[in-house]
């Protein structure tokens, strides 16, 4: 699977502190209109050969050249509709109200030592941190969260913790919740602390008894903690198996609708497909109906303020994202990319991918840049699948030399793609120079050259009918998946300078980057291999595995690959959460892109094939505001 110049925002962001003007004087957010008379109408491609009944067609161009193309469904999101989005929550009054609520919640954190006792202070600290994180407002309280977790960690032990600092016995709920939150904040906590509860609480699995809500919440927090696993942590594998079985058994017996909804959400999305924006929208919906069930450790008045802030913050960010989506849409239309019918038009989906994990208003360049580069990689993907091998070799030469004159004799729409691609890479380099204090264009270009080489190798395999081993395929596929090239420049655009040494810990050849690319390739192949085979692209993880294991079938291959994905995601957890020199904001945004990919490929190819799930995600995240 393979995975922008535009006009400035119409107005400043809302609120003097919550969101600041971010777009002005930024090359990513300006464009020069393209003057190409030959592209004032769609490029004509007349179908003269019957389509394959599944996903393949042959077309004959006006020049008399026959090509094979995938019958990709059209863009689901009309660009005129995107331009009409109202951005209702950009008014300053909303930002001012949000700032007041942020102060109130900050006061809640500061008052924790006054309102908690030695019998419940630990669970109160953890519950408040957990609530602001689930509601998607934790970025406003990073100092307060650190203070709260430092306090909890002071009393952490190998035997776990109880509700309060003077508790004589550890309890499952506080220990499991503490383990999860502390690990996610890079505190050193061992999974062995949970072993006692996996053994002790086995009797909860008695499905003949009416489930106790407190017990269910305990097991739910143990399940959530078990998902933050590192390689070799068998206790977490056991805990996951135990808790999943238990929760599925008791789910039909739960009378509390909101608790039932939370369990269903966690079972369905787990950790690696649960992106921050989706989690926030889901918990806002759940809390909005009744907050009293969620935690006995936080006063309902506090929950009312948390919920109001979460709703307001979600809608304010959504208005910003609508502006960014309009910027992306204008770039798309005015660059003429929308007129290239052979390729997938998925710029909206790619923006969703970036925006569900990267929420900070000041990181517009990250979100828009990622969406632009990803859309262009998809064009290259479809182009390499469509065009004659000799044409592709010329196009590849032009990219590796960054010289448009080389493609003078190629079709006009290849020139369109090259120009848009070249401009996007240069614009992102200008943006990165502001934060890095140096020119990173050559560095980025070299990454693209390596990527193009990997793509050429796959084109050669397709042209010659060569079937590589799984090892050979994955070694090349980690590069051709495109993850590195679409994340590198957006990460460099973040407001954290990265030295060469630090860059090596997050970019190639780091294990972190390798795992991001590998899991993308593996998950993409398990969802797309049948459709690609219908288009004549038979080389995939599945077919390579079957070649290596004569007598095996698709089910065998998928079982092996899904197990491999699970293990590599555990290793990715470790690489993400281990202590190193990489700023967490850089690693975190890259990690969330991985989670976004896992989400959009959760059940099927959420990019190539029409998916009501993806359409609903886009509506809930970026179009439908939350009633306040």
From Swiss-Prot:
Positions in coiled-coil regions: none
Motif stretch (DDXXD motif): 381-385
Cellular component terms per the entry's GO annotation: chloroplast
Protein's GO biological process: alpha-pinene biosynthetic process; diterpenoid biosynthetic process; green leaf volatile biosynthetic process; monoterpenoid biosynthetic process
UniProt catalytic activity: (2E)-geranyl diphosphate = alpha-pinene + diphosphate
Location of the protein in the cell: Plastid, Chloroplast
The organism's place on the tree of life at top rank: Eukaryota
Required cofactor(s): Mg(2+); Mn(2+)
Residues annotated to bind Mg(2+) 1: 381, 385
Binding site for Mg(2+) 2: 381, 385
Molecular function per GO: magnesium ion binding; terpene synthase activity
Root EC class: lyase
Keywords: Chloroplast, Lyase, Magnesium, Metal-binding, Plastid, Transit peptide
Residue numbers binding Mg(2+) 3: 532
Pathway this chain belongs to: Secondary metabolite biosynthesis; terpenoid biosynthesis
Transit peptide range per the UniProt entry: 1-46
Cofactor remark: Binds 3 Mg(2+) or Mn(2+) ions per subunit.
Family (UniProt): Belongs to the terpene synthase family. Tpsa subfamily.
Reported function: Monoterpene synthase involved in the biosynthesis of volatile compounds. Mediates the conversion of (2E)-geranyl diphosphate (GPP) into alpha-pinene.
Protein name per its UniProtKB record: Alpha pinene synthase, chloroplastic
């Amino acid at each position: 699977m393979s995975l922008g110049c535009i006009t400035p925002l119409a107005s400043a962001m809302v609120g003097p502190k919550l969101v600041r003007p971010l777009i002005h004087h930024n090359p990513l957010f300006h464009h020069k209109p393209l003057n190409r008379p030959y592209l004032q109408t769609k490029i004509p491609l007349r179908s003269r050969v019957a389509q394959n009944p599944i996903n393949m067609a042959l077309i004959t161009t006006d020049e008399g050249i026959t090509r094979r193309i995938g019958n990709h469904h059209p863009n689901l999101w009309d660009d005129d509709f995107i331009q009409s989005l109202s951005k209702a929550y950009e008014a300053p009054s909303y930002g001012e109200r949000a700032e007041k609520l942020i102060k109130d919640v900050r006061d809640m954190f500061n008052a924790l030592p006054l309102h908690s006792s030695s019998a419940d202070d630990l669970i109160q600290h953890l519950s408040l941190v957990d609530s602001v994180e689930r509601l998607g407002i934790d970025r406003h309280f990073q100092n307060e969260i650190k203070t709260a977790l430092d306090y909890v960690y002071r009393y952490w032990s190998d035997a776990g913790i109880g509700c309060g600092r003077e508790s004589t016995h550890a309890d499952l709920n506080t220990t499991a919740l503490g383990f999860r939150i502390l690990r996610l904040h890079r505190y050193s906590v061992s999974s062995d602390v949970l072993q006692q509860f996996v053994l002790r609480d086995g009797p909860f699995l008695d499905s003949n008894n009416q489930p106790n809500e407190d017990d269910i919440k305990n097991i739910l927090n143990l399940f959530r903690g078990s998902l933050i696993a590192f390689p070799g942590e068998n206790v977490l594998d056991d805990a996951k198996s135990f808790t999943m079985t238990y929760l599925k058994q008791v789910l039909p017996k739960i009378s509390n609708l909101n608790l039932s909804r939370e369990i269903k959400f966690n079972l369905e999305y787990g950790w690696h497909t649960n992106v921050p924006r989706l989690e926030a929208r889901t918990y806002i919906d759940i809390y909005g109906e009744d907050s009293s069930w969620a935690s006995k450790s936080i006063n309902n008045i506090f929950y009312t303020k948390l919920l109001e802030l979460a709703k307001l913050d979600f809608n304010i960010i959504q208005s910003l994202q609508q502006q960014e989506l309009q910027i992306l849409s204008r770039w798309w239309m005015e660059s003429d990319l929308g007129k290239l019918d052979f390729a997938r038009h998925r710029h909206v989906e790619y923006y969703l991918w970036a925006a569900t994990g990267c929420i900070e208003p000041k990181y517009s360049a990250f979100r828009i840049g990622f969406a632009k580069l990803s859309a262009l990689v998809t064009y290259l993907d479809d182009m390499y699948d469509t065009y004659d091998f000799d044409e592709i070799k010329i196009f590849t030469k032009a990219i590796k030399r960054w010289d448009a004159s080389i493609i003078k004799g190629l079709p006009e729409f290849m020139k369109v793609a090259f120009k848009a691609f070249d401009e996007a890479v240069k614009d992102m380099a200008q943006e990165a120079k502001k934060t890095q204090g140096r020119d990173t264009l050559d560095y980025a270009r070299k990454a693209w050259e390596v990527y193009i080489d990997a793509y050429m190798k796959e084109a050669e395999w397709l042209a010659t009918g060569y079937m590589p081993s799984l090892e050979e395929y994955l070694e090349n596929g980690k590069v051709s998946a495109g993850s590195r090239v679409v994340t590198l420049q957006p990460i460099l655009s973040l407001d954290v300078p990265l030295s060469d040494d630090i860059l090596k810990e997050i970019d190639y050849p780091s294990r972190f980057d390798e795992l991001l690319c590998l899991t993308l390739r593996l998950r993409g192949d398990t969802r797309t291999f049948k459709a690609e085979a219908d288009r004549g692209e038979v080389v995939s993880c599945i077919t390579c595995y079957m070649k290596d294991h004569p007598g095996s079938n698709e089910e065998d291959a998928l079982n092996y690959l899904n197990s491999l994905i699970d293990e590599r995601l555990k290793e990715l957890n470790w690489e993400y959460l281990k202590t190193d020199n990489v700023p967490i904001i850089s690693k975190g945004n890259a990690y969330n892109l991985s989670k976004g990919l896992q989400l959009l490929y959760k059940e099927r190819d959420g990019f190539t094939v029409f998916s009501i799930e993806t359409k609903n995600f886009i509506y809930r995240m970026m179009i439908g505001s939350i009633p306040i």
